[in-house]
From Swiss-Prot:
Protein name: 3-dehydroquinate synthase
Record flagged with keyword Lipoprotein: no
HAMAP family noted in UniProt: DHQ_synthase
Cleavable signal peptide: none
Catalytic activity: 7-phospho-2-dehydro-3-deoxy-D-arabino-heptonate = 3-dehydroquinate + phosphate
Length: 373
């Protein structure tokens, strides 16, 4: 890793900014605040007027919680809403078709604006719709879960699951802007909240150990969703990811570090039939990757025990029983059937990730047995 990169990250992270600008072909802002009403400022910044035609798309769970807020927006702006059934199992072509039909029936045009209000599933689906409807319309992303606020809302990856394979169909498409209010997290159930903490720890392991130290020292305040703790975590993770994607937007090399824990994590999600959530699965995947890093790079074993201890404090799982290794290996290797080795992101040390490290089946099974199984 470049020392210049880390100097930039630390310099920016210590800033107290509430607006982050993501550079690239289509520059956009991320607004971060506790106050939901700051959304109106973002609308003003982007010259969105009360008569601008907008279509708000969410899921039934978010809609039931924020129905009154949505009605308030509708009283000010020209907004029509649509919601679909909550859950990863609905991140499908069928749901996309429902959204396309809604837009067509309401005569959405090229100059219409689509608003995604919800977690990662909503953001991914709506982003894909925006990228394809009439060859591309503007959209605004308003993430409501910790996982979507710190990770999936930035980076341009949009898409849907196909035949059980996560994000098999997708594209890169940036929003007009992202609006984040940590107040959304106050209504998030504990399961979904801790789901995001797995990804927070990932950023700490691959990029900035200070995040891990912060959570270790403040875990009670984090779990109680204290506003200053949530702002620190959200802003820090977003600035770290911003730096990564600006260096490798199309995920051709360096950005691959963000997949730490995901190789095993995706297999856990698939074989558990989504009973293990994404953040939990990534957390488990990181434990396996730490064990592999011990075997391959001689990574200090104390880091594994440190993470295991932190997981338990945060309510994250440390075990997952793999009953069918053949099925599990197929889930890992579904798109690389003709290769014997699987590529991993591993750690030489904290903040020192290595990408595209090939690991054979025997090494993977050994690491699983010594860690999560």
């Amino acid at each position: 890793m470049s020392e210049i990169f880390y100097n930039i990250v630390r310099r920016v992270r210590r800033d107290t900014m509430r607006e982050i600008e993501v550079e690239g072909d289509n520059r956009y802002k991320i607004y971060i605040d506790t106050n939901l009403d700051k959304l109106y400022k973002a609308f003003e910044d982007y010259k969105i007027k009360s008569n601008s035609e907008m279509f708000l798309i969410t899921d039934d769970k978010v809609y039931s919680i924020y129905k009154d807020r949505i009605e308030m927006l509708k009283n000010i702006y020209n907004i029509k809403e649509f919601y679909f059934k909550n859950g990863e199992e609905n991140k499908t072509l069928e749901t996309l078709q429902e959204i396309y039909s809604f837009l067509m029936e309401n005569n959405a045009k090229r100059n219409s604006i689509i608003i995604a209000l919800g977690g990662g599933v909503v953001g991914d689906l709506v982003g894909f719709v925006a990228s394809t409807y009439m060859r591309g319309v503007r959209y605004i992303n308003i993430p409501t879960t910790l996982l979507s606020q710190i990770d999936s809302c930035v980076g341009g990856k949009v898409g849907y699951n196909y035949k059980g394979i996560k994000n098999l169909i997708g594209s890169f498409y940036n929003p007009e802007f992202v609006f984040i209010s940590t107040n959304f997290l106050k209504t998030l159930d504990f399961q979904r909240f801790k789901d995001g903490l797995g990804e927070v720890i990932k950023y700490g392991l691959i990029l900035d150990e200070e995040i891990i130290s912060f959570i270790e020292e403040n875990y009670k305040g984090v779990l109680e969703k204290e506003s200053d703790k949530l702002l620190y975590i959200t802003r820090t993770c977003l600035i770290l990811k911003k730096q990564v994607i600006e260096m490798d937007y199309k995920d051709l090399g360096f950005r691959n570090i963000l997949n730490f824990g995901h190789t095993i994590g995706h297999a856990i999600e698939m074989t558990s039939k989504n009973k293990i959530t994404h953040g939990e699965a990534v957390a488990l995947g990181m434990l396996v990757s730490l064990k592999l890093s011990e075997h391959i790079y001689g990574l200090d074993k104390n880091l594994y025990y440190r993470m295991e201890k932190l997981y338990k404090k945060l309510g994250l799982p440390t075990k997952y029983k793999v009953d069918n290794y053949n099925l599990f290996m197929y889930a890992i290797n579904h798109d690389k059937k003709n290769k014997d080795n699987i590529r991993f992101v591993l750690l030489k040390d904290v903040e020192k990730p290595e990408v595209k490290i090939e690991v054979n089946k025997e090494e993977i099974l050994k690491a699983i047995e010594e860690s999560i199984n």
